């Protein structure tokens, strides 16, 4: 191995070791390690299952802690071994070992970047699960088809990230596609990853619904909000609620449309409307809809608190809640984020859920 490459390898390992130590401090490795021991001890107690919800909460906490503690432990150990081994390999001019260490360094870099990316999640709600509302804009069948394409895109994104996705509500379009849909996405930092997707998404293409092959522009809005838990206090006055039941619509099996199991809740003071139809049980649909309502009310409160700050920010930039954020020009093979200027030419890959380039750029720029 040439001398320059050797020097680069040594410099990389030294840099990675410094970054690993910085991450230990920033992510509070010692405290998380101690907490993990406590959580493991609690989960080993058979009595924990007398309270299934508490046990599930501890299980989720354990996974979150392990993701940090085990990754940093393995990273620190691997870097220490490689730093020691590289000195021996250099002394013996052992090129095979040096190349193996280079390969390990690539893995170290990937793990470091994953952990460093977590520093982008400053919102207290970032670690939570989330709901994604998709609403077709003006444009009839073309816009409704676009809404269904976005639904598929986010389901594919969740699959890529290892998140669990569930369609809670979908209202079919008049001819094709969807008028609206709501999906729940469960996974670590689901809201943190997806929150920058909120906004208006614009599609430009030759419409399959136009026999002349004309070029059409259509819009759909996306709204992402966190699923709040008991640690977030949200008060709902039952007197402010109007609860309606109706028969579920959309794709379904033999039980679909047999009973009024779907639930719609309207919160009079805010005008917020939520609906859920994914379960055959009206009781479970009602509970899920209430959770959605509380989550939307929490997000509304957070946005109200930030109104003045947003006014200042909006005076500096053209990025706001209701502004267009991304343009999908399919016949020119171009998808561009209008906030970060990230542009992708492989449109099908994006529509198949590869949103990471857009999301990472948005988080890094603090969108």
From Swiss-Prot:
List the Gene Ontology MF annotations in alphabetical order.
translation release factor activity, codon specific
Residue numbers of N5-methylglutamine PTMs: 254
Changes after translation: Methylated by PrmC. Methylation increases the termination efficiency of RF2.
Q: Report the subcellular localization.
A: Cytoplasm
Keyword ATP-binding set for record: no
Q: Which InterPro entries match?
A: PCRF, Pep_chain_release_fac_I, Pep_chain_release_fac_I_sf, PrfB
Belongs to which family?
Answer: Belongs to the prokaryotic/mitochondrial release factor family.
Q: What is this protein called?
A: Peptide chain release factor 2
């Amino acid at each position: 191995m040439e001398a320059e490459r050797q020097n680069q390898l040594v410099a990389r390992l030294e840099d990675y070791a410094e970054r690993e130590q910085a991450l230990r401090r920033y992510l509070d490795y010692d405290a998380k390690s101690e907490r993990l021991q406590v959580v493991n001890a609690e989960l080993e107690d058979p009595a924990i299952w007398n309270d299934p919800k508490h046990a599930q909460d501890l299980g989720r906490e354990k996974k979150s802690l392990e993701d940090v503690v085990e990754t940093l432990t393995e990273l620190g150990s691997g870097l220490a071994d490689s730093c020691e081994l590289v000195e021996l390999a250099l002394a013996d001019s052992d090129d095979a070992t040096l190349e193996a260490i280079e390969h390990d360094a690539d893995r170290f870099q990937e793990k470091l970047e994953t952990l460093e990316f977590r520093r982008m999640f400053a919102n207290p709600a970032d670690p939570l699960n989330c709901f994604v509302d998709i609403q077709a804009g003006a444009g009839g069948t073309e816009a409704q088809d676009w809404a269904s394409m976005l639904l598929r895109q986010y389901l594919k994104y969740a699959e890529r990230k290892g998140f669990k996705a569930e369609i809670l509500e979908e209202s079919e379009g008049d001819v094709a596609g969807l008028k609206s849909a709501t999906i729940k996405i469960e996974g670590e930092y689901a809201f943190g990853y997806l929150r920058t997707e909120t906004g208006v998404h614009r599609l430009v293409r030759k419409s399959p619904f136009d026999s002349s092959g004309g070029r059409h522009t259509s819009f759909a809005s996306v709204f992402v909000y966190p699923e709040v838990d008991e640690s977030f206090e949200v008060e709902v006055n039952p007197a402010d609620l109007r609860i309606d039941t109706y028969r579920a619509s959309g794709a379904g099996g033999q039980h679909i449309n047999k009973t009024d199991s779907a639930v719609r809740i309207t919160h009079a003071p805010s005008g917020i409307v939520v609906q859920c139809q994914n379960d055959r049980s009206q009781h479970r649909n009602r509970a899920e809809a209430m959770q959605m309502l509380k989550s939307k009310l929490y997000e509304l409160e957070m946005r109200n608190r930030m109104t003045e700050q947003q006014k200042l920010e909006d005076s500096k930039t053209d990025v706001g809640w209701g502004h267009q954020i991304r343009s999908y020009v399919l016949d020119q093979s171009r998808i561009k984020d209008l906030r970060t200027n990230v542009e992708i030419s492989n449109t099908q890959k994006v529509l198949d859920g590869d949103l990471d380039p857009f999301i990472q750029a948005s988080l890094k720029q603090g969108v």
